[in-house]
Amino acid sequence: MTSTSDTKVCKNQGGLLEIKMEEECKYTTRQDRNLQKNTYNRDVFRKYFRQFCYQETSGPREALSRLRELCRQWLRPDLNSKEQILELLVLEQFLTILPGELQAWVQEQNPESVEEVVTVLEDLERELDELGYRASVQTEEQVTFQEVKPLATEQKPSVSLQFVKAKPGCELAGREAQEEQVSGVETGNEPRNVTLKQGLWEGTEAEQNPASRLAKDALECEEAHNPGEESSGISHEDSQPLRNENGVNSPANSEYAKHQSICPGRKVHGCDECGKSFTQHSRLIEHKRVHTGDRPYKCEVCGKTFRWRTVLIRHKVVHTGEKPYKCNECGRAFGQWSALNQHQRLHSGEKHYHCNECGKAFCQKAGLFHHLKSHRRNRPYQCLQCNKSFNRRSTLSQHQGVHTGAKPYECNDCGKAFVYNSSLATHQETHHKEKPFTQSGPIQQQRNHTKEKPYKCSVCGKAFIQKISLIEHEQIHTGERPYKCAEGGKAFIQMSELTEH
């Protein structure tokens, strides 16, 4: 995959770049649904591949065959290049080595590449800088928060996510109801007990901040697991209701008491709209954007808004002209991976979109839409009741009997009526089976059963049961058109054609 540093950025000359980027943005929007489907299928096959069980197979050869097939469905070597396959493997491993809380946060952003994961983590580090805390995260999914010494006025606090050993006791909280642990907060080199200060987590802005959420959940988890143990580094005073300097209960007291009354990892924050529950209030706030339509992330260039920061980052590529995703077959570059994936189907011949009318398949959805118009053009007669189209007016007239209840075709034997003439013919066969024709019956009816065709055309050799059918057929060779329309004057060879006209 071509890196962004190697990408050539087109300059705006005479407004051409804006038009080109706008067209590409529209093209990408049409493929959003397909991208979501492809991403979901790829993740499903990845999970099947990782969680494959040997006991489900009859032997080692079948197990190997199924593993190969699952791996192929996940990595798609027929569509992806070697660089793209390596990128998928690195992305999976990168998400795996992240601690539970960070992993859950990153996966909520739905990153498509490792670069987007790095961007999300760098944003998190900057937000931790603003809080003035240093977060040191262990690979065993344990987290330790250390307070940073006050720096000089001209110095800016620095924070980074480092892998250090944390005190055992409480697991990291994440999607799978894991819990966090917080070590003693240090000022200088001297450890001291942890106490929540008034106003530390006040305000909606702090709850929405991922960095503050990490620290808050870790502190609450430590309090909930060890409310009165001195060995945990938190005194009995710290497990009591929170009070400010004047002895008044802190605003965070109610949240703290609520957290202590439940088991850690329980989903207690429920959505009033759809009933979905979350372990943290900040996650609920983010989820409510789906119902309220809130889009806090705005593009400074075009003013378009988004619900998630990562989507905004992907959108900005449209304005910068950056095209990091390049096709190895033809060299064409694209601003987004979804557009490249859609383009590569042209080379692979893969066709996902099928026409329900004729079964023809297409690589792109736009091709299917264009093809469907041809079916509509060939069927100009449309039913006003159900919008079904027909290529003949007579067929439309017969179809409308379904809605009106009219049944013009009646059986002479039993009096039963039908909407279509073909239905009547099928019904009459039941009477013919019950009453087979004898030698004394009409000759014409006997020929219908014996399939005898005594009348033969001298020009082409085609045979007919009835003489009138032969006469009408011979008019094709003579060019005679005896049936003429009284209104338009157009002439026809057969009466049925005039009736249809």
Curated annotation (Swiss-Prot):
Species: Mus musculus
Nucleus recorded as keyword: yes
Zn finger residue spans: C2H2-type: 269-291, 297-319, 325-347, 353-375, 381-403, 409-431, 455-477, 483-501
Location of this chain's protein in the cell: Nucleus
Gene that encodes it: Zscan12
InterPro entries: SCAN_dom, SCAN_sf, Znf_C2H2_sf, Znf_C2H2_type
Entry comment describing in which tissues the protein is expressed: Testis specific.
Annotated function: May be involved in transcriptional regulation.
Pfam families: SCAN, zf-C2H2
Lineage of the organism: Eukaryota, Metazoa, Chordata, Craniata, Vertebrata
Name under which the protein is recorded: Zinc finger and SCAN domain-containing protein 12
PANTHER family in UniProt: ZINC FINGER PROTEIN (PTHR24393), ZINC FINGER PROTEIN-RELATED (PTHR24393:SF100)
Molecular-function GO term, any one: DNA binding
Bias type Polar residues, positions: 180-194, 241-253, 437-447
Family designation: Belongs to the krueppel C2H2-type zinc-finger protein family.
Gene Ontology annotations for the cellular component aspect, listed alphabetically: nucleus
Disordered: annotated segments: 175-194, 223-255, 429-450
